[in-house]
Amino acid sequence: MKTIFLSVILLMCSAVSLSAAGLTGRDVMLKAKNRPDGDTRYATLTMTLIQKNGNRRERKLVSWAMDVGKDSKRVMFFTYPGDVKGTGFLTWDYDDAKREDDRWLYLPAMKKTRRISGKSSKTDYFMGSDFTYDDMSSRNVDEETHTLLREEMVGGQKCWVVQSVPNDKHEIYSKRITWIRQDCAMAVKAEYYDKLDKLHRSLTVSNISKVQGFWVMGHMEMTNVQTGHKTILQMSDQKFDLKIDAALFTVARLEKGI
């Protein structure tokens, strides 16, 4: 009985704390969305695909990004191994929640550019990984309805816990629970639930540090808990506010490669 009483008191205190702060779920997600990250960005990435039986496949990529007003553009090219080398992914993410983002995938083996749009961007997985094409882009905060649930400690850091429900019925998840670190406004954990409200995918983020004064993540791990497949993304050589030619973010350059 004492334990139950203590739990109730803690929940009440948490609710009072959140109310006093005046924060909403949308406020928290805006903090994460608007976290300073420079006008341009570069990184090298290592993507490791791990099957349930432990078999691993490794891929390497390079990524550039640029802000254009409130919109952002990003292009990624695979550099390893040979069977995916030259494959490119270009995204134009618009700040307007009513405007669909533009995404293109270039497949050099077929010499063909595929436009990723509509339901495909929500349900298809990026190059055999556990990240959807939508996950690889910058989501507008108002594409979901957010509720601030509580505060919680993760890895010794105080976090806001936010539930996000998508407005688009084509999304593969019914809700997402995200843990946002309060000191750096960065997501460190997320859980995606399917349409039956069962846990579908789980994301963890680690190796958080500062580069050029900006908070960065060095390690992301997305696990499909229903299939046992896992994808690890490791970021390195991250640079900010470097000079980048805007022509890099065009379909013509996507097809030309690096």
PLM regions and their residue ranges:
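N-terminal mature ectodomain segment of secretory-pathway/periplasmic proteins
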Residues: 23-109
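Gly/Pro-enriched, hydrophobic low-complexity segments
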Residues: 79, 90, 102-106, 115-117, ...
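A short, amphipathic edge element
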Residues: 26, 57, 136-148, 197-202
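Short amphipathic beta-strand and strand-loop transition segments with alternating hydrophobic
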Residues: 62-65, 147-153, 206-208
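Bacterial N-terminal signal peptides
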Residues: 7-17
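Boundary at the C-terminal end of the N-terminal hydrophobic targeting segment
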Residues: 18-22
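Positively charged n-region of N-terminal signal peptides that target proteins for export
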Residues: 1-5
